[in-house]
Amino acid sequence: MILKKYKPTTPSLRGLVQIDRSLLWKGDPVKKLTVGMIESAGRNNTGRITVYHRGGGHKTKYRYIDFKRSNYNIPGIVERLEYDPNRTCFIALIKDNENNFSYILAPHDLKVGDTVITGNDIDIRIGNTLPLRNIPIGTMIHNIELNPGKGGKIVRSAGSSAQLISKDENGFCMLKLPSGEYRLFPNNSLATIGILSNIDNKNIKIGKAGRSRWMGRRPIVRGVAMNPVDHPHGGGEGKTSGGRPSVTPWSWPTKGQPTRSKRKYNKLIVQRAKKKI
């Protein structure tokens, strides 16, 4: 996709960078594949705020995505590419030879009229889904199953992909994930070939606070601007620095310090992601 930049004729256009979505479908989604969404605005069942900075925004409909891709050896044709407000990558509407429709995550370079299929012995082509044991080493993949048959759970955001590194004789394949982590997966887990679409999503600049509100994001208040009852950094006479290392409202260290329990162990993780400097 192409990035759109604007002349600064208004303050909100200065620095605005958007994705050109002119090639995507401009109509409504397939009605049978959508359902209305009830916004929680960050509240739980008792009405208390459990997730801050949520609320408002445009109404959206959830699109049912086929993460399992379990219809083996049934080819489908890409009818159109669509925008999905609930995720960063684009989605593709697939029509099979029995006139059944489904949505899948659209890989980069997938075009209208292309054919996609799920199977064991099929071509290594963008959009096709295979077990890891049948995918060549070095291939870039996405929508990977953690447990066979449960549907793709990881590597599903815009521009992301994992790389198949090796295969062993114990029924596992090693993948390098987008975070830099090396992890083992069962070799019969399904994965889809290619890098996900909307690669330039990371270069978007929203331009103004109002656009954040359209997306359902509310303002973030600094802890030092609160009262002591609301935040560990709150209170004090006049402006203060907080007086302690940065923490969350629940006193967990922030600013990059690991908070995961050292006692937790996962034998499938070969090497954890390295710290970013």
Swiss-Prot record:
What would be one Pfam family of this protein? Ribosomal_L2
Please provide the record's keywords in A-Z order.
Mitochondrion, Ribonucleoprotein, Ribosomal protein
Question: Could you give a GO molecular-function term held by this entry?
Answer: RNA binding
**Polar residues composition bias: which ranges?**
248-259
Q: Which Gene Ontology CC terms are recorded?
A: mitochondrial large ribosomal subunit
SUPFAM superfamilies assigned to the protein according to its UniProt record, in alphabetical order: Nucleic acid-binding proteins, Translation proteins SH3-like domain
Q: What PROSITE patterns does UniProt report for this protein, alphabetically? A: RIBOSOMAL_L2
- Classification via HAMAP family: Ribosomal_uL2_B (MF_01320_B)
Into which family does the record put it?
Belongs to the universal ribosomal protein uL2 family.
**How is this protein named in the record?**
Large ribosomal subunit protein uL2m
Question: Quick one: which gene encodes this?
Answer: RPL2
